[in-house]
């Protein structure tokens, strides 16, 4: 069963509903270097951070129509890093002025037996991929440039092939619900990356 | 007579002012060359030359003006030559001509060029006359043609280099790729989709259809799962997970309503319909754990 829309949920102490604001685009391989240079200039000054992550998407199919989706991610290049479990809700539609895709987001770190746990709960893995790329930050904005690799032999993360000749570029912010000025900041930042990359709000439903 | 005199005076004044301007710009150019030669750039020199050329042009225009009487018809005759210093003259010439004497007059009131220069000019004119009108015409034409060719080449080069700079040299992103990547991340389009249907191997990449599962959202395409071939899938419904923002809060508040299991013979033991705490004792390995696709997680 899908979680009810955020606006209907009563605020009953404890946690704040976090929303993820997202803008996506892509860049071809040969232009990656220029994009990285530009991001290094625009973003906060830190060591360039690369990452290799293995993400698995789990589905829980109920009697209802839509399955419940959880995303489990683990780092392939950082030993000892915790696994990361994420729930992403449906994109909130309606406000055409909002410049970013907004969806409910729940993030948590877990231990390594996450997959066992999920299987026991009845989740089944739907698909998996390896993401390899770079991470940048600017304030609360996170910019990730990564390439998606298809896993050819299930479970074997070494045997991968690239899905396309492009890198996916994502600009995301996780912020409490209701802070729409965040999307304005994101749009201003996205303007600075043109014409290398066009970051825009892409509705996944359109791409079914 | 009066009118002509007035015209003469007016044109003389105009000429004087033009010449004064020219003198000033020449002076500043020389100063620039002498004092700032190490910092001088070619565009700056070009600017000075352009200024000079502009002023010469206006001077020419003034001379050609219809109101200007022909100066050729005027003659300047020195009336008094004296070797004494003349203060007035000094003032007027800004200290350059102190004495109006025999040495100064031939230079300043000259109307013909130097004898050597005159000789050269005469020679050139005789050469030109010697060639003959036709040959001269041909030479003029070939010169014009070469000049125009050169100009054309230069302008073409300039145009090409400009357009080369303006043209975006290459596309830096591919919108189709963007869509493909977003679809892959959102719901696994193009990635190997795992179907726990017991059949071996990953489904063909890029095969949408029954196997395609969509990222969690209501109202999306329902995944058709036939009951019988899908073993060991107890039907769980109504899983609600508390919104836990920080690590460590995850285990709390998990309520599972577990309805009856599937009809398949290989099914888990039935649980009571109640809140279920996950305890070690509960976990029984469901049959088929050694199924190939599950061996991943060992």
From Swiss-Prot, chain A:
Keywords: Activator, Nucleus, Phosphoprotein, Transcription, Transcription regulation
MF terms (GO), sorted A to Z: transcription coregulator activity
A Gene Ontology term for the protein's cellular component: core mediator complex
Residues the record lists as Phosphoserine modifications: 66
Record carries keyword Magnesium: no
Record field: transmembrane: none
GO biological process: positive regulation of transcription initiation by RNA polymerase II
Subcellular compartments: Nucleus
Xref: InterPro entries: Mediator_Med18
Domain of life of the organism encoding this protein: Eukaryota
First-listed, main subcellular location of the protein, grouped into a coarse class: nucleus
Family: Belongs to the Mediator complex subunit 18 family.
PANTHER family with a match to the protein in the record: MEDIATOR OF RNA POLYMERASE II TRANSCRIPTION SUBUNIT 18 (PTHR13321:SF2), MEDIATOR OF RNA POLYMERASE II TRANSCRIPTION, SUBUNIT 18 (PTHR13321)
Known role: Component of the Mediator complex, a coactivator involved in the regulated transcription of nearly all RNA polymerase II-dependent genes. Mediator functions as a bridge to convey information from gene-specific regulatory proteins to the basal RNA polymerase II transcription machinery. Mediator is recruited to promoters by direct interactions with regulatory proteins and serves as a scaffold for the assembly of a functional preinitiation complex with RNA polymerase II and the general transcription factors.
Subunit and partners: Component of the Mediator complex, which is composed of MED1, MED4, MED6, MED7, MED8, MED9, MED10, MED11, MED12, MED13, MED13L, MED14, MED15, MED16, MED17, MED18, MED19, MED20, MED21, MED22, MED23, MED24, MED25, MED26, MED27, MED29, MED30, MED31, CCNC, CDK8 and CDC2L6/CDK11. The MED12, MED13, CCNC and CDK8 subunits form a distinct module termed the CDK8 module. Mediator containing the CDK8 module is less active than Mediator lacking this module in supporting transcriptional activation.
Protein name (record): Mediator of RNA polymerase II transcription subunit 18
Gene: MED18
